[in-house]
């Protein structure tokens, strides 16, 4: 949240006359009570003559492409002559008689923008009539000439004090559990504790903010309002102001506070709602009352209903969205944004102010579903003080009448009561026990009362009722945190805990780390696969309806609407990474990822036990039964070349054999031997897919992806991938160390001709078995096909490494073993030895 230093210090100064603080001290104060500040910055300085001026006359210059105005401005004696200053200006939001801010020649505005006198548009322009953006008070979209009340000062007076340019803007990081602090009211309460100041709640005494409430006491209902129970609306209030000046602009002091809070001034009614929100933390909405027909209904939207929000986007509504309707249709998306049909305009003379307390979960889901985060939704998601509704309505009405005239209707519609806050019991010694610091009972009670709690003392036990704006205080631990936070976390001693026995990585963690290291050493780059996916991916792949991978867990509030299920496979995320890299010009790479996947178990709906007591064994069992199965998977994907062309020779493309080898890398790191078998498993190519087996059980697949899948997904041809279930591999607690021999090895090759349908891995396994105990490794190094071999035949060449642990082998011994391997291959596979 952005907020100006002078605003919070001014609110605190009302009850603490003479108190002042530097920006550095204020920053430390925020941190002291647990708020991080992203930073703070002074309003950029303007040097030289910056004065008040009164526009005496305006000459419209119409001979140019855009409308230009030649103004004569009374700046008193600030220009040294007392004559009216000639200034060219293109802005249209000021008139003769207005008090404006003038930068005279010699002034330098933020951004080193020097002001001088020069001829332009055929006239002499000696100065600039300034906008808020040009003085560093706002961004460009908030730009507009600053107009001030006539009583702001005399022509020629220095404008800096009037504008409050000696100010600093803080960006305070408010955590999700402390929504009350998204307001000047909440932050000043915290700062009062940080600096031991007297605090007066602006909601109880609005004069702290210089605002007099002029709204009459409510007398009767304003209009009929039907709030449906299914919307979970806590409170809903409405008041009306009639007969306002539609062209009235918000005073500069109000616009200034909004601009420094990064809010854009729009019109008087809207500015008032935004100011009340920033001051009290109560989001409001203003309707053009003449555009509301009949009463209002707060209901859930019908699925498929459409609604155009104030940002001129037509939105398809869900049955979970809460809307405010009149007899003609939807007028607002509750807690998020209003609609164009009842928008405040420059013709609005009657205004309905709405202040409500919406269900935080509903607002959060609506905001995410429509990707529409607003200042209002941010506050409702975190919780808004339900007791603030009446004050917010009266303040908004009073401010609007002060700015734009009109009268406040005596009627007020108010639905819902302020909820009773549940009490919390806590031993007064509990903060001391947890922190290891002695806090007196008086200190504990005082700190809780500073927060706004009502505290009753009964011996050594406190009964605490949290204030309505602190819905995050639900248990004793929350109260302990408040005491520790306000007393200072730096007072808690730092003690290194004694490490428990058996520390270190578990065997499963060691295996996961070993697999990651092995794949990285093999040249694969690691990515972190997304835990979410689009279920339509399975349709692109052509999976059967009963495929296990379609057994997904649906996410109720997904970060992205189309990625609304938990991933049952890592490949969608891996292939998305391939697509992104290829579209950005990178075509040769191989990636790996290790991540849990999730399969739905039971009906996928878990109970919601109370947090006030430990759940029973039955509830715990029910919770565990509904948790998804989350096995750990590893996946690799490769495209383009794995070996690059250069002076050393031609390159080599990443093939299905490399994908299979990546599976072997995983297995070796886990101390497991894989078996391979032909497989027909989408999204892989049926003729280039291998099933990965351990003890006869399929644990994964590897190979080249199906050409149609690649085409539909916009991926390069011949892209290959592997995915394996790591948790399905037997866990080897102690991997055997390799046996090293001091004796030399013998290398021999063997080439076998087999049918095209016989897998190379099957041949390799038979050769290894037939070669006996003397063979250390059997590796395929060549696959050959030709007319001489015959149709449907292929030649597989293997390199055999022989070694004996206790002697030097002879060539004859190695040759006997090689021939034995060939004989077994002939017997089992019909293989014929070549050459």
UniProtKB/Swiss-Prot annotation:
Its cofactor is Mg(2+). CDD domains: PheRS_beta_core, tRNA_bind_bactPheRS. It comes from the Bacteria. SMART domains: B3_4, B5, FDX-ACB. It catalyses: tRNA(Phe) + L-phenylalanine + ATP = L-phenylalanyl-tRNA(Phe) + AMP + diphosphate + H(+). Residues 44-160 form the tRNA-binding domain. Residues 419-494 form the B5 domain. Mg(2+) binds at residues 472, 478, 481-482. One of its GO terms (molecular function) is ATP binding. It is an enzyme of class 6 (ligase). It is found in: Cytoplasm. The keyword Cytoplasm applies. Binds 2 magnesium ions per tetramer. Keywords: Aminoacyl-tRNA synthetase, ATP-binding, Cytoplasm, Ligase, Magnesium, Metal-binding, Nucleotide-binding, Protein biosynthesis, RNA-binding, tRNA-binding. One of its GO terms (biological process) is phenylalanyl-tRNA aminoacylation. Pfam families: B3_4, B5, FDX-ACB, tRNA_bind, tRNA_synthFbeta. GO terms for cellular component: phenylalanine-tRNA ligase complex. Its EC number is 6.1.1.20. Residues 741-834 form the FDX-ACB domain. Tetramer of two alpha and two beta subunits. Belongs to the phenylalanyl-tRNA synthetase beta subunit family. Type 1 subfamily. PANTHER family: PHENYLALANINE--TRNA LIGASE BETA SUBUNIT (PTHR10947:SF0), PHENYLALANYL-TRNA SYNTHETASE BETA CHAIN AND LEUCINE-RICH REPEAT-CONTAINING PROTEIN 47 (PTHR10947). This is Phenylalanine--tRNA ligase beta subunit. The gene is pheT.
